[in-house]
Amino acid sequence: MKALITGASSGIGRDMAKILSKKGYDLVLVARDEEKLQEVKKEIETNTQIIIMDLSVEKNCKKLYEQVKDVDLLINNAGFGTCGDFTKTNLDKEINMINTNITAYHILTKLYLKDMKQKDKGQILNVASIAGFMPGPLMATYYATKAYVVRLSEAIREELKKEKSNVKISILCPGPVDTNFNNVADVEFSIKGLSSKYVAKYAIKKLEKNKFYIVPGFSIKCAKIGAKIAPTGLVSKISYKMQKRKIK
């Protein structure tokens, strides 16, 4: 069995790699930080290939697909966020985020899904966020990218069900997690985040059961339900207050 994990140099990606290695998976780990990837590789027992690559560049996503074939499990995990008033956040950084959080997911999901459907086996885990179920004032672009991942995955899931395919797709939708995401986005969560180890362990456990929505943490499950049943305006107001509190 072979798993391809993007954003594997730290946080959830790193911890999922360790768990899958213990389950016997050979791994292909992708990230931009070679030093951190080498550190992860040292901690893994099974056959591991590391690829240093910036997935915000479209041609690199296609290049990765050409380099790595016969993937049993694809985990799209690379991503980052920005925080601030929409008119004041850096446009270039946001475009880079859209390319990483959306375009890379879209390309890799499409290319590897085609192969998996031909073999009628395989699994894809798209790492989204609870943010994908609600508006996110002061983190507008990030929330929108995660909404794309959620809706794309939901649509693909239905297509696979209608085709009676054995290929499975899932989305991981955590809330705050103690990772480097906070430093990159320049935010500090007002509630304590879950550990990346817990989220990774929970995700793999649910993935093995073919769970589609993987939502770690009771409070985050409640937030997902609340976002669905509450008026959008109310959800936006609550979201705004939460974002305002966590801007450094």
Language-model regions: role of each:
Residues 129:
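Residue(s) in the substrate-gating loop at a strand-loop-helix junction
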Residues 9-10:
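Conserved glycine-rich cofactor-binding loop
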Residues 52-63, 91:
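The beta1-alpha1 cofactor-binding region of Rossmann-like NAD(H)/NADP(H)-dependent oxidoreductases
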Residues 109, 145:
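Active-site helix of classical SDR
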Residues 85-87, 93-98:
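Substrate-binding pocket helix/loop in short-chain dehydrogenase/reductase
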Residues 171, 188-224:
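C-terminal helical subdomain
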Residues 77-82:
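Conserved NAD(P)H cofactor-binding loop of Rossmann-fold oxidoreductase domains
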